[in-house]
Amino acid sequence: MVNRHVRIYIEGGAEGRDANSDFRRGWKKFLKELHELARANGYHSLEVVRGKGRGNTFNSFKVHEREHPNDLCVLLVDAETAVPEGACVWDVVAHREGDNWQRPSWATENHLYLMVHFVETWLVTDQDALQKFFKQGFKQGLLPTTHLEARSKDDIEQALEKATQGSSKGSYRHGQAHEIIEIVRPDRVKTLRHGQRLFDDLGRLIKGEPET
C-alpha cells in the first residue's frame, strides 16, 4: 500500500545549512491541527515543502502530479496585494504583475491559499508570540491590531521595524518568519479571513468533502 501525504508548498525561508529543516519544523508545528486531521483521514502525514522563491514554489507545486501522483498537494504563498472579498484566488495570481500564474488543469480554488498581504500579517496577529520571540525591548503597543488584511506590506513592515528595533534580537528580518510561525497560535491567524480559509477549506479537502 502506498503511503499518501498532504504536501503544502510554502513560499519563503532563510538561507543556511539547516534552512530546509528549520523551515519545515516551524511550519509543521503551526499546521499541527491539519496534520492530525490528515492522519485521521487516511494520510500518512502532512509534509511541508519549502519552495524558497515565489516562482520556484509555484513551479514545484504545479508539477506535483508527476512527482507525487498519490498525494494531495496545495500551494501557500503571499498574496503581495489586497484581495477583495469574494475574489477567486487564482484570478489574483493570474492578474498580478510578476506572477501571471495559470491554474493547473487539475487544481481548484481549494488548492491555492494566500497570506494577505504576506506572512508577516499572520505573525502580527499573535503579539504574545512576537513578545516571546523578541523578548526585552519589544514594543507591542506599536503594532496594529485591526483590519490587518487591509493594511499594506509597507504599513506592516514599518510597524514591525518600530516595534522590534530596540529588542534583544534587533529589528525583524524576513528570514525569521518560520521561527516565529512555530510559536504563533493558529487561532490568532484564524481571525483573518484568509487564515480561517486555510484551515476550513483545506480541512474539507483533506476530508474529501465537496467544495463550497
PLM-predicted stretches and their roles:
Residues I8-I10:
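Short hydrophobic beta-strand that contains or immediately precedes a catalytic carboxylate
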Residues M1-H5, R17-V48, F58-T212:
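C-terminal accessory helical subdomains adjacent to catalytic cores in phosphodiester-
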Residues G12-E15:
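Short polar catalytic/cofactor-binding loops
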Residues G53-N56:
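Short helix-initiation/N-cap motifs at beta->coil->alpha
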